[in-house]
């Protein structure tokens, strides 16, 4: 989201994305990978923090240790343990070992060594996720609880420096960092963000020249789709409905879940409601972000699981009758929680209409909540149906499939399947770690289980409809971790 985007404006990690989304060096000038794939050695370039301190390997050690320290309860600590497989990360998070046992070592000021439990094919792509960014320990200790809350408590090592920001403000500014190691190739003098909640006001601000880039909603697309400054870019997010399989007995019935997913017309949702370039999705992993050993997109074929979830009123009716018989009920009523934002509310209304029309006797009641509350309710299991989304944190299908492992914090409905868990374990810590082709095939098998049991009802892959000034060039749009990067951007007078 935008918060990660801004953090990356003023902070560099070890690696960054090139224009095509591939991992290339940032603060790590070079790196070595051991023959067994379990040791990464990063050699840092000469770089400075905005207070003049050198960026050192110790800054990464401190930042990573903070991320796994159970006292900090970081929501992204799993990026080092489950995802990154950094030695001892899981044990530290569980409180079984001290943070000093984390498998990351400052060999010297310019050399960082990372030890992994198993080979992780996508490890380099994790390095541009903000959880893996460095933190200057001495500076942090002068800020403590206020760290990151104002320009005075933010330290930059990236292309830009935070110069104006207040937590409750509607605008914040960054200026070019003259000490950035690649400052000669940064064309922009700075970035000025405005928080504008009214999308029509934002569009008007763009049209008057007050903004160079803004997001659009579906209704606005019709107004501007012929404007050469209009673009639609993949955002990487999969929007889906999560049924609470554990807490709602009716939703524990697989046939009822199948009836519901077959009742959803995704083409109508994207074509008639969103109209922003978002595409129907019939997979649990959206397309255009994960490439396999053979160079192909993991989810390029959107027909492979169509028989498990594509709109089919006849199939929906058939599964519905079976479910009613099994449950001994002719009617059902479910509450669905949805974000208090424009697009999710419109999508939820159409989902409600489709389910109620195709499955007579089934009622969906919509409860609109602020996003933060909706997420909290789903994490707490305080929901029946939830309209939610997930974006890829790194360039591998596991960023989605890992969510459905028993006990994962994002497995909101508490679904559990031993075969699925076993496949994911083999792909994460087992023999398949060293068999890229076998691992890829196994991930397809895992995805099939999720869809065939209707663990989620995938809806669409999100695109962002945006206006970007014709005077601006070089903005990189990515579906993974950071949606927009401005290092190569320029603005003509």
Where would I find each of the regions flagged by the language model?
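Aromatic- and charge-enriched surface segment that lines or borders ligand/interaction sites
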Residues: 29-79, 113, 250-252
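Gly/Pro-rich hinge or "lid" segments in bacterial periplasmic/extracellular proteins
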Residues: 116-186, 190
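Ligand-site clamp/hinge motif
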Residues: 154, 178-224, 236
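Structural transition elements
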Residues: 279-322, 341-345
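Long beta-strand-rich cores associated with HINT superfamily self-processing modules
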Residues: 466-493
